[in-house]
Amino acid sequence: MKKWMLAICLMFINEICHATDCFDLAGRDYKIDPDLLRAISWKESRYRVNAIGINPVTGYGSGLMQVDSQHFNELARYGIKPEHLTTDPCMNIYTGAYYLAIAFKKWGVSWEAVGAYNAGFRKTERQNQRRLAYASDVYRIYTGIKSSKGIRIPATKKSLPEINSVQNN
């Protein structure tokens, strides 16, 4: 029984370590701060590889980065199946980084684009509020991650600092 529990614990630890490396790799490949990807993953799934989150508008989100089911048809063209997103942490992290990179390309490297990762691009007051709330949550998580590494990020009360100034700290 103890050996069985140890084996499960080691598999879980291995999966987390593997996923941690994937944040760094995806960040490098998409030129996104890996800690920003980590912050989004914590906000979306609390780092749960097999997380499923219901989205009343589009269906559901899958895995660490909560990749939305609305993208499944597009992802299928690349051989990515929904089950890959809840069983392969690297696939999920890279897919999330891909969609964040699309948001950055569309709206620039900004907290508004981070908000669009979750709330989409529709330009309505409600969506603007959802983007800001999401980006603010991610920013708080992100600064916590940076702080744990001894990196200070300027606090601001009015608005979020420019994302590039934060990433370069």
From Swiss-Prot:
List the InterPro entries hit by this protein, alphabetically.
Answer: Lysozyme-like_dom_sf, Transglycosylase_SLT_dom_1
Per UniProt, which keywords does this protein have? Plasmid
Pfam families in alphabetical order: SLT
Family in the record: Belongs to the IagB/IpgF/P19 family.
What name has this protein been given in UniProt?
X polypeptide
